[in-house]
Regions:
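N-terminal pre-domain/capping segments
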Residues: 1-132, 153-163, 227-230
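Active-site acidic/histidine proton-transfer and metal-coordination neighborhood
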Residues: 93-227
Length: 234
């Protein structure tokens, strides 16, 4: 819901189990309108939508997306942020380190994140100044990162995703940011680790050059775009 001064408070749907889009949709219909009626009756109600890779692929189908957008309009709901952290099963199973896989070394994580951004661009209201965000894993589970090549693979995929977000912004007019979420026992666990990874790798010269070539930007614009589209959530 809108708090004023451009701030939004959302109801995070990852509290409810649901791995398929059918399960997620049923949960939304059962719970969210009732919660909105109690929390902010007569006002728009923001949702932080959690989608697994499987659910995201289903929602990306035009008929499914059109039906969901109609549901949002009918109940005065809007989506401005997505939880793209758990790729697969999140409820009803022992997740532990498996929740971080596939991680940012892999094409699967990149494709999943691109799909989420595409969906959010179609769901995000056209309100002036409203930007979308997608949360994601903090790179990888720390024990899985053993070599410089692992770090380089994460860097390259994050830069590729930034290029996707730049292109998406040009096409849709929607600004979306990917937010890595530091957690214990992960590659990004502390502020110092995050500052080092972003400063030395994500925002480094190689990343600027890659994004400039990928997105047709000058070096200064590419450096700014990396900072505009890649960050942290705490």
């Amino acid at each position: 819901m809108k708090l004023g001064r451009g701030q939004h408070l959302g109801y995070c749907t990852n509290i409810h189990p649901g791995e398929t889009w059918a399960q997620v949709g049923a949960s939304l219909q059962a719970h969210v309108p009732l919660i909105r009626a109690r929390v902010c009756p007569g006002q728009p109600f923001g949702i932080g939508l959690r989608l697994s890779a499987q659910a995201a692929q289903t929602l990306a189908e035009p008929a499914q997306l059109a039906e969901f957008r109609q549901f949002l309009r009918a109940h005065d709901l809007y989506v401005f942020t997505l939880n793209g952290f758990p790729y697969g099963t999140f409820h009803g199973a022992t997740v532990k380190e498996a929740v971080y896989r596939p991680d940012w070394r892999t094409p699967e994580r990149l494709r999943y994140s691109n799909t989420l951004a595409d969906l959010l661009a179609q769901l995000l209201p056209g309100e002036a100044g409203l930007q979308g965000s997608v949360s994601t894993v903090p790179g990888a589970f720390k024990a899985d990162i053993a070599t410089a090549a692992d770090i380089e693979a994460m860097r390259r995929n994050l830069v590729s995703h930034a290029g996707h977000l730049v292109a998406l912004g040009r096409e849709s007019g929607r600004h979306i940011t990917l937010a890595l979420e530091p957690e214990p026992c992960c590659f990004l666990e502390t502020i110092a680790e995050a500052v080092d990874f972003f400063g030395q790798h994500v925002f480094g010269a190689a990343s600027v050059a890659e994004l400039a070539a990928h997105a047709g930007l000058g070096p200064a614009a590419a450096a700014a775009a990396l900072r505009d589209h890649l960050g942290l959530c705490l």
